[in-house]
């Protein structure tokens, strides 16, 4: 039913809700809470528009302009809160279902690959290409290949990389650089131009012994003129032993087999010359040399730069040889050889066997000590591969002009004897 002059409201689906609010006596209105009175006095805006939840209710009732009595204040408040909450939920659901435009962020950073692709396209269109900074990042091989195709292969190699290194020897066809017609001047080292004998082809480093010996031929006087004191182990500091200490005592005992002494490879500094008996030792030789064989003065006139070793008289006894130092230790022998050049040698008594001798030699790798063993037939052999000799001077005389049969010294000979120093 409708009343004239009043607004129309939709009747709720739940019966008894509005009727209960209308019923009540004036005493009930007086005892109502202030909050309930205020909420009842205010116009119900949510009742003016039909709610989606109550759209199926077609019956409408007029709302009187006069204030309606409020019977239950708390219940009415709960109902209004429930309706407002339901309406907010519907609005939120509608907002979720409606499509929204995507927000584009201006500060988005593209990956490194995207930047490289953009620069490649800009370079192909004609704009100047920007060279990226070298930050240590390297593209994979496939990516580099694709980028090269995009850029159009601007940088092309003018000359392909050679697969092999340039040979050391120039071409033999006569064509040289800068259009010169003369062939390239060089010293031929081919086998047909080689001056060495066939048995020396396996030692290519030993070319021209004369040149090597002249290059390392430094006189001992240069060392003495230096302002600083002589180093430890110089020739002047070597002790001179009396003649009685060099005599070999005891009968000869047979040995099972000749053996090599252990060699010590100590790398030394630059090569220096050894004191030759033909220079300063000529006037200071022991007195026993003056009474010896006059042939012993022959090696004193030979030059140390000769490819052959200084001549040794094999008939002269061992005690009268200038390169025999008697009973000195291995350390003293190395100190004597330290200032001498390569292929310098001396003979001393063996420290392990009193009937044997040791040959101390200076090589390019250090010092070598080889044993001169005595066999059952009272012969002497050098190492294990040399033929037997009747005496030690014969061994020195033989290998002064021949290669040593010792492993590690096959390319060497006994060239420069280390003479004895006397005070």
Curated annotation (Swiss-Prot):
Gene3D superfamilies (UniProt xref): SH2 domain
Tissues expressing the protein: Expressed in skeletal muscle, brain, liver, prostate, testis, ovary, small intestine and colon.
Chain positions covered by the region annotation Disordered: 1-87, 110-208, 225-312
Keyword annotations: Apoptosis, Phosphoprotein, SH2 domain
A Pfam family annotated for this UniProt entry: SH2
Residues annotated with Phosphotyrosine modification: 201
Domain SH2: 323-418
Compositional bias ranges of the Acidic residues kind: 192-203
Disulfide feature: none
An MF annotation (GO) of this entry: phosphotyrosine residue binding
Coiled coil (UniProt feature): none
Mod. after translation: May become phosphorylated upon binding to PDGFRA.
InterPro entries: SH2, SH2_dom_sf, SH2_domain_adapters, SHF_SH2
PROSITE patterns for this protein: SH2
GO biological process, one term: apoptotic process
Keyword flag Manganese: no
Miscellaneous comment: The sequence described in PubMed:11095946 is over-extended by 57 aa at the N-terminus due to the presence of an uncorrected 5' mismatch compared to the reference genome sequence.
UniProt-listed PANTHER family: HEAVYWEIGHT, ISOFORM A, SH2 DOMAIN-CONTAINING ADAPTER PROTEIN F
Free-text function comment from the UniProt entry: Adapter protein which may play a role in the regulation of apoptosis in response to PDGF.
The protein's assembly and partners: Interacts with phosphorylated 'Tyr-720' of PDGFRA via its SH2 domain.
Protein name according to UniProt: SH2 domain-containing adapter protein F
């Amino acid at each position: 039913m409708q009343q004239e002059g009043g607004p129309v409201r939709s009747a709720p689906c739940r019966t008894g809700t509005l009727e209960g609010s209308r019923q009540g006596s004036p005493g009930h209105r007086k005892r109502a809470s202030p909050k309930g009175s205020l909420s009842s006095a205010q116009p119900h805006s949510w009742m003016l528009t039909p709610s989606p939840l109550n759209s199926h209710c077609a019956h409408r009732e007029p709302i009187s302009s006069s204030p309606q009595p409020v019977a239950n204040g708390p219940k009415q408040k709960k109902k209004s809160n429930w309706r407002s909450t339901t309406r907010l939920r519907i609005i939120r659901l509608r907002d979720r279902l409606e499509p929204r435009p995507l927000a584009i962020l201006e500060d988005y950073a593209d990956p490194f690959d995207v930047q490289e692709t953009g620069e490649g396209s800009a370079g192909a269109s004609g704009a100047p290409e920007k060279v990226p900074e070298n930050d240590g990042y390297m593209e994979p091989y496939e990516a580099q290949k694709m980028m090269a195709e995009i850029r159009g292969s601007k940088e092309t190699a003018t000359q392909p990389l050679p697969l092999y290194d340039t040979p050391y020897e120039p071409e033999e066809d006569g064509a040289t650089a800068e259009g010169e017609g003369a062939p390239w001047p060089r010293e031929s080292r081919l086998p047909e131009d080689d001056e060495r004998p066939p048995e020396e082809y396996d030692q290519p480093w030993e070319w021209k012994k004369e040149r090597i010996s002249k290059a390392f031929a430094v006189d001992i006087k240069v060392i003495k003129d230096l302002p600083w004191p002589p180093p430890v182990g110089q020739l002047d500091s070597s002790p001179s032993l009396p003649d009685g200490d060099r005599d070999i005592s005891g009968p000869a005992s047979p040995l099972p087999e000749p053996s090599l002494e252990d060699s010590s490879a100590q790398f030394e500094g630059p090569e220096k010359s050894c004191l030759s008996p033909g220079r300063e030792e000529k006037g200071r030789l022991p007195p026993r040399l003056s009474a010896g064989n006059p042939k012993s003065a022959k090696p004193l006139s030979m030059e140390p730069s000769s490819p052959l070793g200084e001549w040794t008289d094999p008939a002269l006894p061992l005690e009268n040889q200038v390169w025999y130092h008697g009973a000195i230790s291995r350390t003293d022998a190395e100190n004597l050889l330290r200032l001498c050049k390569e292929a310098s040698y001396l003979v001393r008594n063996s420290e392990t066997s009193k009937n044997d001798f040791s040959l101390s030699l200076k090589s390019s790798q250090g010092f070598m000590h080889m044993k001169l063993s005595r066999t059952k037939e009272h012969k002497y052999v050098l190492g294990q591969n040399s033929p037997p000799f009747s005496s030690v001077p014969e061994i020195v005389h033989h290998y002064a002009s021949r290669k040593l049969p010792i492993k590690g010294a096959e390319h060497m000979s006994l060239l420069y004897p280390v003479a004895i120093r006397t005070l």
